[in-house]
From Swiss-Prot:
A double ring-shaped homohexamer of HslV is capped on each side by a ring-shaped HslU homohexamer. The assembly of the HslU/HslV complex is dependent on binding of ATP. Belongs to the peptidase T1B family. HslV subfamily. Keywords: Allosteric enzyme, Cytoplasm, Hydrolase, Metal-binding, Protease, Sodium, Threonine protease. This is ATP-dependent protease subunit HslV. Pfam families: Proteasome.
Amino acid sequence: MFHATTILAYKGKNKSVIGGDGQVSFGNTVLKGNAVKIRKLNNGKVLAGFAGSTADAFNLFDMFENLLQSSKGDLLKAAIDFSKEWRKDKYLRKLEAMMLVLDRNHIFLLSGTGDVVEPEDGQIAAIGSGGNYALSAARALAKHTDLDEEELVKSSLQIAGEICIYTNTNIKTYVIEDEK
C-alpha cells in the first residue's frame, strides 16, 4: 500500500482526465500538502500519475517519457517497453511504485512488478492509498450523474480525501481534450 497518494484517471467521451491529491506523509506526519504527482508528456497528449516514493518518481517519469518519444507517442508500445525495462533493471525492480498513464485511446496501470493493466471498463483506474475510495466514487458518479469528466475526477478525489487519512483534498487535475 502506498501511503500519501491518490491518483485517479478517467477516459470519458470527450476528455481524458487525471487527478491527484497533494499530500505527502512520512509515517504519521504530513510533510507537504500541495505536492504535484502528475505530469504531462508527449506535448500534453499523454498524462501520467505516480504513487510511491517521490524521489523515484522523477526517474520513472523521465524513463517513461524517453520510451514514449522513441515509440513516437504510441502509449501501448511505450507502456509495454517501460514494463520490460522496469522488470530488467535491478534497481528499479526494488521500487514499490505504480504509475497511471493515459491518452485519448488508452488508460494503463503500470506496476513495479512489470504488470501493464488496462481497466476492464477501459475508462477508470486509480492507485495509491485512497485509490479504492476514488475508484468506487468515480464508478458511482459515472453511472448515476451527468458530471463532466473533470468534475467527476475532482468529486471522486474529494470523497477519497474525506475518507483516507493519507489523502487530502488539495486536488490537481490535468485534461486532454479531443482535437477539433
